[in-house]
Structure formats: structure tokens, C-alpha cells
A protein has these predicted regions:
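Hydrophobic, well-structured mid-protein blocks that either form specific transmembrane helices
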Residues: 120-162
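Intrinsically disordered, low-complexity peptide-like regions
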Residues: 8-9, 143, 233
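Acidic, serine/threonine-rich low-complexity disordered tracts
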Residues: 24-125, 166-276
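Bacterial N-terminal signal peptides
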Residues: 8-20
């Protein structure tokens, strides 16, 4: 049971994770070289809410195949009861061009004696087709080595977060939908973000103004396709995830903002409560 829960917690982390839309123009990625955001992860089951992990998202300017890029990095490690029964030390990297387009993704899974690498390389054809080389391997053998082809918006799971952060809220209306696909192994999983307006998020002693989105994910790891997960993005110029909640077959996974450094703009979405 714990192995399954840990795996799904990791899926939730990816949504902490570009082109312009038909009716909504995407703005410049709200990133800053050296940006870092820390998160706490929890497993929630009824009244039980236990610490399950820690995650760090960081961004820096880099190069990919000789061209300028944004390097987006996710570090995840288990904690609490998950750490005791199913230790995880996982990393994910992706490179975005300055256009921006997702160019390359690498996920390294380190779970005790189990080590796995998932690489995705994206090539954009003039016809609008995207060719994706998916290569999955362990230290001893290749598990998957195949080509995926798609049209539209296709990302790795971390890159989907960059897509959400790029959206221009100034012209967004309630109920707006943003479909995309996620490349995983041999599969292209259909998903979409749905905008439902502004909300206040509270966690411990902190409050944040946010924009709320549902995530519809058509994958058997989630209890239902519609509203399988939710994400609350800080309502300021940084567009960083403040809270994420994913329904699991047993309970739910929740991710909360903890701290941030070197953001592009002040974190004005945080509501400062005057002490009496």
C-alpha cells in the first residue's frame, strides 16, 4: 500500500510542474535565474494528515545543445512515515527554450535498491507535429526506447507546471479550459487545466491570494478523471504554485508552499496579517 501511495505522491509533486493559446495569449515565463521554491508534502486520510516528503523547485539560465534555455529542476525526498517504509530520493530536470518550448526532460527515480531513468527529447516539426524520443532504462538494461508523435501541447509532468505558469490571467474567464498531453513512457496521457477563479488559501499561520485550477487527468492512478487534482497558483507576477491536492485511491496527497528565494517579483500574493 505504501509503495503505491508514495508513487502517487510523486505524481502530485510533478504538478508543482507554453505556446500561445487559440483564444488566450501566453505571457513571458515569469522566471528568475536562481529562483527556488520549497514545499512540504502530506498524505491525508480522513482526520490523519502526516508529513510525507519535501520538494524543491529551482530555475536557472542554462544552455541546451548550444542554445540558451531555462533549466527547471525538481528535487523530491520522502519524509515521515513514507521515509520509514519506502525511502525515495527522486530528481527531475527539464530544459525550455526561450520561445518557450520544452526541449528535454530527464526523471531519475531512486527508491532504495530501485533506480530508473526516464528521458524525453522533443523535436518540433514544421507541420506542427512533435516527435518525442522516449528512453527508459535502469543501470543494467533498456526498458523503453520508442518514438511518440503528437500535435498540440505535449509536456513531461514537470513541464506542465511551466505551461500553467505561462498563462495570462488578465483575459481569462471562469471555466476556461486548457487541454494538453503528458508524455510518460510509451503513453500520451490526456489532461487539461480548468480555471475556476480566485480563492484564499490558508495553511498554518499563512494566507495567500490564489488562482484556482482543476486538473483533469485520464490515468488509472487517480480515482476519477474529472477533478483528479487541484492547484492553487499565487496571484502575483511570480505565478508559483501555493497548494496542490490530488485525490488518490486511498486518501489524498497535498503539497503546500513553505519558502522561496530569488523570485522575479515580490511575493505579494501572501496576505500579511497584522498582529494585535
Amino acid at each position: 500500500m505504501w509503495a503505491a501511495c508514495a508513487s502517487k505522491l510523486y505524481i502530485c509533486v510533478f504538478f508543482l510542474c507554453v505556446a500561445s493559446l487559440t483564444s488566450l495569449r501566453a505571457q513571458t515565463l515569469p522566471l528568475s535565474h536562481g529562483e527556488r521554491v520549497d514545499y512540504d508534502l502530506y498524505f491525508k486520510w480522513g482526520l490523519i494528515m502526516s508529513k510525507a516528503g519535501l520538494a524543491t523547485l529551482s530555475v536557472k539560465e542554462s544552455e541546451y545543445q548550444g542554445a540558451p534555455s531555462w533549466h527547471y529542476n525538481l528535487l523530491f525526498r520522502s519524509a515521515g512515515v513514507i521515509e520509514k517504509v519506502f525511502r525515495m530520493r527522486d530528481t527531475m530536470d527539464c530544459h525550455y527554450s526561450k520561445e518557450p518550448r520544452l526541449l528535454f526532460s530527464s526523471k531519475r527515480t531512486n527508491e532504495g535498491d530501485y533506480y530508473l531513468v526516464d528521458n524525453l527529447q522533443f523535436e518540433y516539426q514544421g507541420s506542427g507535429r512533435i516527435d518525442i524520443h522516449s528512453h527508459r532504462h535502469t543501470l543494467k538494461e533498456t526498458k523503453i526506447d520508442t518514438m511518440l508523435m503528437a500535435k498540440g501541447r505535449v509536456f513531461d509532468m514537470l513541464g506542465a507546471t511551466m505551461y500553467l505558469r505561462s498563462l495570462d490571467w488578465r483575459t481569462m474567464s471562469y471555466g476556461a479550459e486548457f487541454p494538453f498531453m503528458i508524455a510518460i513512457g510509451r503513453e500520451l496521457v490526456n489532461a487539461r487545466f480548468r480555471y475556476t477563479g480566485q480563492q484564499i488559501v490558508e495553511h498554518k499561520e499563512a494566507k495567500f491570494r490564489t488562482r484556482h485550477f482543476y486538473i483533469d487527468i485520464y490515468d488509472e492512478a487517480f480515482t476519477q478523471a474529472k477533478e483528479a487534482a487541484e492547484v492553487w497558483i499565487g496571484d502575483d507576477e511570480n505565478h508559483i504554485p501555493v497548494k496542490i491536492r490530488a485525490k488518490l485511491k486511498i486518501g489524498a496527497a497535498e503539497v503546500y508552499y513553505k519558502d522561496s528565494y530569488n523570485l522575479r517579483a515580490p511575493l505579494t500574493c501572501r496576505i500579511v496579517v497584522q498582529k494585535k
